[in-house]
Amino acid sequence: KKSLYYAVLAKAGLPDAMETISKGFDSGSAVDKDNAFYALLNIKGMAAADKLAEIAAADDAAYAAKALDVYVQRIAASDKTPENKTLLLSDVLDIAGSNKALSAADARKIETKALQGLENNKTFQGMMLAGKYLGNADADVSQAAVMAVIRTALAHKEFYGPAVTELLKKAVELNKDKDSNYQREEVQKHLASLPATGGFVSMFNGKDLTGWKGLVENPIARAKMKPAELAKKQAAADETMRKDWVVNNGLMEYVGHGFD
């Protein structure tokens, strides 16, 4: 039976297992599809991660939520660096927030788990990403974001500056944890211990590309240019930059095709 065949392939971890199981999911009968899917869920490590992410982002409600949930589990259990896990969890949040095949309840549950993952990894990028979910309409999502911001900041004294202070103050106000009073005191002491100036200053306002400019050749070449030539090339570079970069859901997204 193919159900047993897929299960054996998944357990054995053979090099061609993913290709065979993926083919069964993509083009097999309804029964084959189900069997292949459950085999994918049982492949340990990150071997099936890309396929699970693909299924999670697709419009098949029968599989999307479970695929995304297991994908989050695989990220958490992997040996990837905290920075790489943060990037993958960012993709999870994008899928959870945009895939209409997910029910609202499933999307919120997965967002909560992804934010908890950001808390566990405690990266600067993860803290800033979690900040976008502070005050979310779903209480669990908002609280997960609160804890990700607070615990990441408290673990890293090198994370400071106006943007970090603003996030921490907002997180403290929204905190519904049973230990919120104690955590408020921790945050206040933490903020008082940080340098009053310097630190992280956001180069991106989260709305548009104001202040961003395209790159004109290299510093040596620019230094040799006359003002009129530099201005002309800068205008062309700025136009290219605006074509290559867009703002999507508060994040800068590259849509270009690389350098010529």
Regions found by a protein language model. Give the residues of each.
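Structural detector for internal amphipathic alpha-helices that build alpha-solenoid repeat scaffolds
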Residues: K2-P15, T20-K23, K33-G45, E54, ...
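Core helices of alpha-solenoid repeat scaffolds
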Residues: M18, A49, K85-L89, M127, ...
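Alpha-solenoid HEAT/Armadillo-like helical repeat scaffolds in large eukaryotic proteins
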Residues: T20-G28, K51-D59, D91-L102, L129-A137, ...
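Hydrophobic beta-strand residues in large extracellular and virion-surface proteins
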Residues: I21, A36, L52, A114, ...
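Charge-dense, low-complexity polyampholytic segments
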Residues: E158-E173, K226
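Carbohydrate-interacting regions of secretory-pathway proteins
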Residues: E173, Y182-D260
